[in-house]
A protein has these predicted regions:
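Perimembrane loop-to-helix junctions flanking transmembrane segments
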Residues: 78-91
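Acidic side chains
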Residues: 42, 71-75, 88
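Alpha-helical transmembrane segments of multi-pass membrane proteins
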Residues: 61-72
Length: 264
């Protein structure tokens, strides 16, 4: 049932993306060709020699942490020394960034908003952010899901950090992956160094929350972030023009939203 749900999720995301990119006055076949070409280029980028080499390095580093005492030592330090009511509150506020049921409709809405208001700077920027986020998820989710089970890692509350291939499905943090995507795609469109650095830091918050809540080891959160970074790099390889206006995800009361930022 879980595999079926995942498949339906990816198929639905592809269909939604196709509708999002459809332009007024063009036939559906043209829109499908456009999205097929765009996504195929994203996949070509992700499975290129350079990206796969970077992915392998990330997997190797995560494995080094998981299969030694380092992961559990980090977890113990966070739980015994760093975690408190304040970190729990922050963690609770950033956790929704990793909830696909909340964020994917937000990205789709941003993409649709961009299509209807593409002649305005705000509309085009919002649309690009939404589409890039959807594309990053579409290209990064399959390898992330595979690595979750292939590594066989378990949660801190369940077992040790060591990898036991196909024994469990928590070797990569899905929340860390999903929570990093909107910040990373926004960072790709920012030229201001301070804004870019702030967004990169923001992309790590959801992964950190999983460590704080004792739901994932450091290596699992880090690997989820790394897959998101590589996927966002491929989804954001276009649209490199300078931007003073960017759209970033924002946590609001009882939900998620987006915030437009104009910097000078």
């Amino acid at each position: 049932m879980k595999k079926l749900g995942t498949a339906l999720f990816l198929i639905g995301l592809l269909i939604l993306s196709t509708l999002t990119w459809a332009e007024e006055g063009k036939e559906t076949s043209g829109a499908i060709e456009k999205i097929t070409y765009t996504v195929s280029q994203d996949y070509r980028c992700f499975y290129s020699k350079e990206i796969l080499k970077r992915l392998a390095i990330g997997i190797g580093l995560a494995g080094g942490l998981a299969n030694t005492s380092i992961d559990e030592e980090i977890q113990g330090y966070v739980q015994d020394t760093l975690r408190n009511t304040g970190t729990d509150k922050v963690s609770e506020s950033v956790k929704p960034f990793g909830e696909g049921a909340i964020t994917i409709p937000l990205y789709a809405g941003a993409a649709l908003f961009g299509e209807f208001t593409k002649d305005s700077k705000l509309g085009s920027t919002t649309g690009e952010w939404g589409k890039s986020s959807l594309r990053a998820i579409l290209v990064g989710a399959p390898p992330m899901l595979f690595l979750q089970r292939a590594t066989g890692g378990s949660r801190p509350k369940e077992d040790g950090s060591r990898w036991m291939p196909f024994n469990d499905n928590n070797g990569v943090s899905g929340h860390s992956f999903m929570g990093a995507v909107p910040f990373l795609t926004a960072a790709k469109g920012a030229d201001n160094l301070y804004v870019k650095c702030s967004l990169y830091l923001g992309s790590m918050l959801c992964g950190w929350s999983r460590i704080n809540d004792n739901d994932h080891y450091f290596s699992q959160a880090a690997l989820g972030w790394w897959v998101a970074y590589l996927a966002a790099s491929c989804a954001g390889r276009t649209g490199k023009e300078s931007k003073r206006l960017i759209v970033v995800p924002a946590s609001i009361k009882d939900g998620m939203g987006a915030l437009a930022v104009l910097y000078f």
